[in-house]
């Protein structure tokens, strides 16, 4: 029988995972902002949709792979959550110290079709399989993959990841579009540092609580 509390737990964990995966301004994030500024908000948003679809593909691949080692996961949940927190902390530090402005490339003056903007973002994101390690860390940290999960619960979890990712892209394109006259290269740099700082803060708390034997999430 499906428990409401279980569904709610899956929903919020999946949503947070989707946001964390999408938020750092890597090549696709910068591309999304560029297209929002140069072509319009919805061109930026479909760029985010393309990135989200690729992320979901990697999330499914990661979850499927981890499903074969349930016994190992259950027996070593402490170490896996510790690993997940450390990996997220490293990811946050990298994001904080990186300069996304270096990823800026000239954008074609031609808007192109929505599908073209979607598929190019999908391809760029798909070309970075290292995101699997981020999903492993997140799934371990949030205990997202567990034994005996119903199909409905699994589908709900991955849909929540997609919703979190899409919410981020919808929000960032809305924000950039609203402040387009004031948004510059320094704005991109500052936004990325804020994101990195938040990820470091959350992962730091997770690391401390794990070492204390408590559950932060």
Segments and roles (model prediction):
Residues 2-78, 137-155:
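Juxtamembrane transmembrane-helix termini in multi-pass membrane transport proteins
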Residues 42-117, 175:
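Membrane helix-loop-helix hairpins that form the core translocation module of multi-pass transporters
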Residues 50-61, 127-129, 161-169:
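Membrane-embedded alpha-helical segments of transport systems
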């Amino acid at each position: 029988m499906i428990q409401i509390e279980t569904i709610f737990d899956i929903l919020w964990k999946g949503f947070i995972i989707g946001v964390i995966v999408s938020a750092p301004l890597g090549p696709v994030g910068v591309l999304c902002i560029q297209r929002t500024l140069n072509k319009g908000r919805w061109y930026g948003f479909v760029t985010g949709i393309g990135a989200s679809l690729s992320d979901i593909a990697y999330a499914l691949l990661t979850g499927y792979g981890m499903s074969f080692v349930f016994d190992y996961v259950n027996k070593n949940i402490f170490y896996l959550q510790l690993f997940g927190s450390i990996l997220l902390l490293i990811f946050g530090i990298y994001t904080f110290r990186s300069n996304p402005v270096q990823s800026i490339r000239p954008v074609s003056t031609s808007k192109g079709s929505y599908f073209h903007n979607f598929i190019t973002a999908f391809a760029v994101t798909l070309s970075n399989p290292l995101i699997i390690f981020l999903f492993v860390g997140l799934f371990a940290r949030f205990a997202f993959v567990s034994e005996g999960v119903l199909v409905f619960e699994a589908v709900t979890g991955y849909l929540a990841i997609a919703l979190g990712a899409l919410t981020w892209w919808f929000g960032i394109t809305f924000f950039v579009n609203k402040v387009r006259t004031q948004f510059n290269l320094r704005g991109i740099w500052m936004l990325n540092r804020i994101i990195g700082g938040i990820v470091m803060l959350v992962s730091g708390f997770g690391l401390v609580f794990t070492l204390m034997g408590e559950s932060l999430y």
